[in-house]
Swiss-Prot record:
EC number: 2.3.1.255
Start-end of Basic and acidic residues biased regions: 204-213
One GO term (biological process): N-terminal protein amino acid acetylation
Protein name: N-alpha-acetyltransferase 11
Keywords: Acyltransferase, Cytoplasm, Nucleus, Phosphoprotein, Transferase
Taxonomic placement: Eukaryota, Metazoa, Chordata, Craniata, Vertebrata
Organism: Homo sapiens (Human)
């Protein structure tokens, strides 16, 4: 399974995945809008045959008086590839890209009040908090929870990893002990290794604004089903 940045020629297959998984669907111009405006923020999951089995469509909110923050427009994983943690990986990758490219402080999304599996994913796995209820947010009149995830902890972790890389180390995990003694790494503490220059790599549910509401009623999750809007 591979997670990678979405390319323009992925958009048709992302739309197809959306149609299979979610009741909130978008015209192709909406995918193009995201892809052209924020090409760094949307990701796809593909299987061993290169077929798209999940995606996250994301953007930055354009509110000049607010702190920089991102928004998850849509997240879906095909039924055949659920319970593999793909939704969490897609969400984390999009959030990291928001921090690295736009210095985002938090990320937001909307989810149907009735979508218990997605709420479980966002609240229990990804640490989103409900910020408010938006009445009749969806085209069928259902209310949405507006949710936010603070990105300061992830930003600190990314800075730490960058500092380690600058010092000549590659981080092998997300919460490793940063201390080494001499050139020896003990089994219980360090999860960093000296870089090898030869092998180092470079590098929601919706209406259309009130044409379009986003769909984050995820159809996947490490636990059950994920989706967002």
């Amino acid at each position: 399974m591979n997670i990678r940045n979405a390319q323009p020629d992925d958009l048709m297959n992302m739309q197809h995945c959306n149609l299979l998984c979610l009741p909130e669907n978008y015209q192709m111009k909406y995918y193009l809008y995201h892809g052209l405006s924020w090409p760094q923020l949307s990701y796809i999951a593909e299987d061993e045959d290169g077929k798209i089995v999940g995606y996250v469509l994301a953007k930055m909110e354009e509110e000049p008086d607010d702190v920089p923050h991102g928004h998850i427009t849509s997240l879906a994983v095909k039924r055949s590839h659920r319970r593999l943690g793909l939704a969490q990986k897609l969400m984390d990758q999009a959030s990291r890209a928001m921090i690295e490219n736009f210095n985002a402080k938090y990320v937001s999304l909307h989810v149907r009040k009735s979508n218990r599996p997605a709420l479980h994913l966002y609240s229990n796995t990804l640490n989103f908090q409900i910020s408010e209820v938006e009445p009749k947010y969806y085209a069928d009149g259902e209310d949405a929870y507006a949710m936010k995830r603070d990105l300061s902890q992830m930003a600190d972790e990314l800075r730490r990893q960058m500092d380690l890389k600058k010092g000549g180390y590659v981080v092998l995990g997300s919460r490793e002990n940063q201390e080494t003694q001499g050139s020896t790494l003990s089994d219980s503490e360090e999860a960093c290794q000296q870089k090898n220059p030869a092998t180092e790599e470079s590098g929601s549910d919706s209406k259309e604004p009130k044409e379009s509401v986003e769909s984050t009623n995820v159809q996947d999750s490490s636990e059950s089903s994920d989706s967002t809007s």
